Amino acid sequence: MLLCDIGNTFLHFYHKGRIWKEKPYALTKKKENLPIYYISVNERFERCLLASHPHCVNVNEHIELQTQYVGLGVDRKAACRAIDNGVIIDAGSAITADVMQEGVHIGGYIMPGLEAYRRMYSDISPVLNREIEPGVNLSILPQNTADAISFGVLKSVILMIKNTSRTKKLYFTGGDGKFFARFFENAIYDNTLVFKGMQKVLEKQI
């Protein structure tokens, strides 16, 4: 069984513990006897997968989650299905936070990802068009513009997560997940959360 998470930039694949990503218009041919089960938040990229691999199974409708949140993305639902208690932080193009308690989704929120923050600053003024410096000192107030931008971005994200998690265990995933996880003692980085959630659902369905 091959699992696929179709996002807004790449298609992420999972097979026997291995994860890799492919561009939608440069997909490698998979074995015909290996069924592909996928979730998708991008219809255009989904069509790319189906054009080259017509015998795929969309499991979006099977990813159910007990929640009052309206419009929760299927990728976030799948990640939430992987745990019963804790806070899931998916730090990618956007940074999402979802709180799980006894298998119930309590709620969540969305913040810009690091690259989105950088673009927002550059839209304000060319002077603010600076890269986010991950090594900026967060213990002292900055004394220059470049550090001030990085400090403001990172500190706002970190403090928001700390305020949400408090004593709860944190599960980080996504491209910048490993970076943010190092700021928290009660955190682990697991880039397989979405696929673990998919597997849990599929075990009951097939």
Curated annotation (Swiss-Prot):
Superkingdom to which the source organism belongs: Bacteria
One MF annotation (Gene Ontology) recorded for this entry: pantothenate kinase activity
Localization per Swiss-Prot or TrEMBL: Cytoplasm
Catalytic activity: (R)-pantothenate + ATP = (R)-4'-phosphopantothenate + ADP + H(+)
Residue positions of the active site: D75
Obligatory cofactor(s): NH4(+); K(+)
Pathway linked to the protein: Cofactor biosynthesis; coenzyme A biosynthesis; CoA from (R)-pantothenate: step 1/5
Family membership noted in the UniProt record: Belongs to the type III pantothenate kinase family.
Function: Catalyzes the phosphorylation of pantothenate (Pan), the first step in CoA biosynthesis.
Protein name as annotated: Type III pantothenate kinase
Organism: Helicobacter hepaticus (strain ATCC 51449 / 3B1)
Lineage: Bacteria, Pseudomonadati, Campylobacterota, Epsilonproteobacteria, Campylobacterales
